[in-house]
Amino acid sequence: SLVAAAGISIIPRHVMGGTNFIPPSDQLTKAVIGVGGMGQGHLDYEGTRLLAICDADANHLSSTLQKVGSGVKGYRDFREVLQRPDVDIVHIATPPHWHGLMSIMAAEAGKDVWCEKPMTRTIGEGKKVVEAMQQHGKMFRLNTWFRFKDNFYGMGTPVKKLKKVVDSGALGWPLKVTISGVTGFNWKFYWVGKENLAPQPVPAELDYNMWLGPAPEKPYHPHRVHGTFRGYWDYDGGGLGDMGQHYIDPVQYFL
């Protein structure tokens, strides 16, 4: 053949990259919006290629760009990310008050969505997200990750095995399920909201207007943003709507 005559050897791509190698052309491309907390866990997934990250906090953005290396572009405005035609999937790891609107806008931009829990702050917002996904033919995955990791709330109980037992009928029917919060972490202590907070200057690195987004305009205080935002109805759906999903979702799955 011409190839043999030229002394050219064609090596299968899996040989160069190993048995689990996925060439860039076959990988899904993604962007992660919100990299100050849970978004760090969305940066590196097998079979995907990270193209962009976005955060309203410049410190979060710069530190994460150093971590992921070259080839990844940083943004302060998520709308610029959605305009990129080369992004297949948008990972949303912002506070919950942004989940609904960002998911809908991502679907409108032709992106599939992988969203951190809770899906949205309210049931009504969640219904709008479902409608948008159906209308635009996009996929939506909610990252209730204890189900996917098959480890009920990190306590070692395999969810899939428990589902098999329930499906077998060995436990009888109907079942009564009691959910308790024995996790070794006091959510209420760490994430309870505070009243009468004195307004403070907005840090230079934070685009506070972008962080607030669709939430009511309130004076800045560090306790209302980042890790402690969960204690405020403006940004989250309370303990049951947020961390409660980790308990409730696996139960819904195996029932």
Question: What are these model-derived regions, one by one?
Answer:
Residues 39-40, 99:
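N-terminal Rossmann-fold NAD(P) dinucleotide-binding loop
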Residues 35-36:
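Glycine-rich Rossmann-fold phosphate-binding loop(s) that bind the pyrophosphate
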Residues 49-68:
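NAD(P)-binding Rossmann-fold cofactor-contacting core
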Residues 28-30:
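Conserved hydrophobic helix-helix packing surfaces used for dimerization/oligomerization
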Residues 199-255:
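Glycine-rich, aromatic-lined ligand/substrate-binding cores of catalytic
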